Amino acid sequence: MSSREEVVNFAAGPAAMITSVVEEFGKDFVNFQGLGMGVAEISHRSKQGSGIVTSAESNFRKLYNIPENFHILFMQGGGTEQFAACLYNVYAHHALKNGNAKSLVANYIITGAWSKKAYAEAERLGFPCHVAVDMKELAGKYGSLPEDKDLKFTPDGETSLVYYCDNETVHGVEFNEPPTNIPKGAIRVCDVSSNFISRKIDFTKHDIIFAGAQKNAGPAGITVVFVRDSVLARPTPAELHKLNIPVSPTVSDYKIMADNHSLYNTLPVATLHAINLGLEYMLEHGGLVALEASSIEKSKLLYDTLDKHDLYISVVEPAARSRMNVTFRIEPQELESEFLAEAEKHHLVQLKGYRSVGGIRASLYNAISVEQTRRLIDLLESFAKAHSN
């Protein structure tokens, strides 16, 4: 049996959590605020339950300096549910001013597996959609970012939304800046699930931002959505039916969730409490400035180690490398299973790459310290030495 102190969990999600946060949550799971009930047993509509929601909203605003013209929603269904939710809400919003909203086209910037899945969902649901760029088609594989000239958007006034994934968890690709030259009138949608709470967000360049909590914020079960207030405006469902615009399911409707303080249906307040404990910890330990500095330090140490050994092949162009999900191969690839087995012996776990791409992936989320990253680096060094020609 291994102790928590021995094991370094490099999982891509659900991922490692800060130990002191887990310990505090464990106490509250048994007895929350002296109620004689655990936090998972209290009503989401109770004073304590709604207090968790209010506190988490406040802490997110402090951490990100979120403008007052953005709502914070706590939803369910993961990032995958947001693939559909953003479409329903955006088309309903456009219908308020454009009777021909159903002809507007959703544009997707595809840089890896998750943005591709988002596009596939739009196709499956029958929304008009267009690929502004697919980096696999452009470059032969996922591992780079598009230049402005690569982005082939539909024209101004004909575009419903522009969607991109800020950090591709599977392929280890991360944007350095939001895409530019977005068509006029388009709603800007961004999936930040796997680099959430790791750097500042420019809210002037986004309208909908969402993140599944299970990577950098806490346990699975809640999706955090930041949505510009203006996007919440939409016709009634009856009016949308007349315009032949799809009506969002109730639990995916941003306006309903905003009007009900994220408590329209049963919110997993225990999960949100765990997230909020993490927010409090991060605010007390330097906030986003400290978190970004740590992520840069950890990823630089790891990439520098990979780059100096021919045994390791980084599969992402340097300018597109993720700070969160470091992906690489070992040549010859037969050595990868040996490396993973050796890592397990050293209590370095969950390093196997995503099932569709293979290889090695080390996820350096906030709960992974510089010291823990150095433990992986030490193994990489010794493994390279043992297999040098």
Swiss-Prot record:
InterPro entries named in the record: Aminotrans_V_dom, Aminotrans_V_PyrdxlP_BS, Pser_aminoTfrase, PyrdxlP-dep_Trfase, PyrdxlP-dep_Trfase_major, PyrdxlP-dep_Trfase_small
Any single Gene Ontology cellular-component annotation: cytosol
GO biological process terms on file: L-serine biosynthetic process
Reaction(s) catalysed by this chain's protein: O-phospho-L-serine + 2-oxoglutarate = 3-phosphooxypyruvate + L-glutamate; 4-(phosphooxy)-L-threonine + 2-oxoglutarate = (R)-3-hydroxy-2-oxo-4-phosphooxybutanoate + L-glutamate
Pathway: Amino-acid biosynthesis; L-serine biosynthesis; L-serine from 3-phospho-D-glycerate: step 2/3; Cofactor biosynthesis; pyridoxine 5'-phosphate biosynthesis; pyridoxine 5'-phosphate from D-erythrose 4-phosphate: step 3/5
In-chain residues carrying the UniProt-annotated modification N6-(pyridoxal phosphate)lysine: 215
Its job: Catalyzes the reversible conversion of 3-phosphohydroxypyruvate to phosphoserine and of 3-hydroxy-2-oxo-4-phosphonooxybutanoate to phosphohydroxythreonine.
Name under which the protein is recorded: Putative phosphoserine aminotransferase
Record organism: Schizosaccharomyces pombe (strain 972 / ATCC 24843) (Fission yeast)
